[in-house]
């Protein structure tokens, strides 16, 4: 039987991908996106790893019934992960709306999305609830205000596990306390090209923060995209964590900007050649793998930040990078595709978009 809630959500997901945005989000150099995530659990139930299916179903039902009454999810039911096709699950991971863990162990896992896909709630992942709010810049105040209101609502309407000494209780001890993970996706091609990235990663880690690949723990930084997040959740307030993260990101942005200046002065022809070749490939490809695509688009995002192509198209570049991922292509086509079909379709999407991108104007 077709789940109408799942169909409506995937249709909305597809519409957002295909929309020609008029009010585009403001972007800043180096920063791609940001996220605040809260881990919460219900009192009286075992953590997900140790709970029986019946208890997990009860947890999900309670959470879903409560969320349906919240204005962001008014009359929106959660949908079961097991109701999704494989490529639909993968698209949600590619879009960072849910984790790889949620789609791998999905017996009683559910997901709720806001209409704009900027807020998502995972049920029965590692914790009973994983609440996420996304942004396109460093405006953590607005993001925190939004997630804090939602969290207050859940705490008022559900019996959330909380200890006066330790704070919010979570399945993983490293999340105990605030239960908050704040992260920023940054684009650091120049630090990689100038071989400074290892030193930067070590410096960030010494300050108590973690640097991971594009899709978090265990993933590769394809296209030189890195995720920086807090490691400590106990003994610090949410405001302290966010303030420290913002300071670190600003420092990383400065180091990346300085590395780009070094490339302009010392390896100018090499830099221009790489950017020019990437644009040529994107305009002329007829079959393109996902890694090649993200590496070429990465150079175009760098070119936009450095004003070699209009900065105004950076948002579009970020979006085309998402649309050209394998599962997203299948969502757009609304059917599963073979690998060769995906690579041909990806090339078609990229050719069409980059035909509209102005030629690179080097200094």
Spell out what each predicted region is.
Residues 1-165, 180, 194, 199-201, ...:
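Long, Pro/Ser/Thr-rich low-complexity/intrinsically disordered regulatory tracts in eukaryotic proteins
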Residues 167-186:
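Conserved phosphate/anionic-ligand binding catalytic regions in large, soluble enzymes, centered on
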């Amino acid at each position: 039987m077709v789940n109408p809630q799942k169909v409506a959500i995937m249709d909305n997901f597809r519409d957002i991908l295909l929309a020609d945005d008029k009010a585009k989000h403001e972007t800043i150099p180096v920063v791609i996106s940001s996220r605040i995530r809260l881990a919460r659990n219900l009192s009286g139930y075992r953590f997900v790893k140790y709970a029986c299916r019946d208890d997990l179903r009860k947890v999900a039902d309670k959470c879903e019934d409560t969320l349906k009454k919240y204005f962001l999810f008014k009359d929106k039911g959660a949908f079961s992960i097991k109701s999704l096709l494989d490529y639909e699950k993968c698209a949600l991971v590619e879009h960072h709306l849910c984790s790889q863990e949620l789609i791998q162990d999905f017996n009683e896992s559910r997901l709720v999305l806001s209409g704009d896909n900027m807020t998502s709630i995972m049920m029965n992942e590692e914790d009973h609830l994983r609440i996420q709010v996304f942004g396109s810049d460093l405006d953590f105040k607005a993001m925190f205000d939004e997630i804090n209101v939602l969290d207050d609502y859940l705490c008022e309407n559900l019996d959330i596990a909380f200890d006066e000494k330790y704070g919010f209780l979570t399945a993983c001890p490293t999340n105990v306390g605030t239960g908050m993970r704040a992260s920023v996706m940054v684009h650091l091609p120049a630090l990689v090209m100038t071989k400074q990235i290892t030193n930067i990663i070590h410096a960030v880690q010494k300050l108590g923060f973690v640097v991971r690949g594009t899709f978090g723990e265990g993933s590769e930084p394809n296209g030189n995209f890195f995720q920086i997040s807090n490691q400590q959740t106990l003994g610090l307030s949410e405001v302290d964590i966010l303030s420290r993260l913002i300071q670190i990101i600003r420092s990383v942005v400065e180091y990346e900007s300085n590395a780009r200046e070094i490339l302009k002065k010392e390896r100018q022809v090499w830099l221009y050649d790489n950017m020019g070749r990437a644009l040529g490939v994107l305009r002329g490809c007829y079959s393109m793998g996902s890694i090649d695509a993200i590496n070429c688009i990465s150079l175009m995002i760098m070119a936009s930040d450095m004003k070699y192509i209009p900065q105004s198209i950076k948002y579009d570049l970020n979006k085309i990078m998402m649309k050209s991922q394998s599962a997203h292509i299948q969502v757009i086509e609304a059917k599963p595709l073979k690998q060769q079909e995906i690579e041909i379709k990806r090339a078609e999407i990229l050719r069409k978009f980059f035909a509209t991108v102005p030629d690179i104007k080097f200094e």
